[in-house]
Amino acid sequence: MKIIKKENSPQYARDNIRSFLLVAESTVGAKHITTTLVEMDPGGIQKPHQHEIEQCYMILEGSGVMEIDGEKAVVGAGDTIFIPSDSIHSLHNESHTTLKYISAGSPVFGMKNERELWPLNWQS
């Protein structure tokens, strides 16, 4: 059994966003899924980007504005958002509280993609 502790996972911080790499090829040898816990401070913005993989965001706390391929929606705790592969997506925390969510992607990003997504501030 593999149990991943947030405080022991690789971390990446950028622009009011902290990401914790939980399940991945590099952390547990995952072959089909990557999961990340993301904490976004008020005013934080995940800039528009896209991946070849499918993703979903499961909002744990807070709220924000999600945009996928030009369509915007307010999302909050309890919501799960599906992001099709190659969709341009972003998330903006317009609230006054921290937005926390789990990002799950499949198939797995792979080591090369992990390093591209988790560049300079990589910590473990």
Residue ranges and their predicted role:
Residues 47-48, 66-67, 83, 89-95:
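Short beta-strand His + acidic residue motifs that chelate non-heme Fe in jelly-roll/DSBH
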Residues 36-51:
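Conserved short histidine dyad/triad with adjacent acidic residue
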Residues 71-85:
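Short acidic-glycine-tyrosine-enriched beta hairpin
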Residues 1-32, 116-124:
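A short, N-terminal "cap"/entry segment at the start of jelly-roll beta-barrel domains
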Residues 52, 71, 87-88, 97, ...:
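A generic "binding-loop/recognition-motif" signal
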Residues 54-55, 59-64:
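Glycine- and acidic-residue-biased ligand/ion/polar-headgroup-sensing regions
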Residues 38, 82, 97-113:
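A short hydrophobic beta-strand segment most commonly corresponding to one strand
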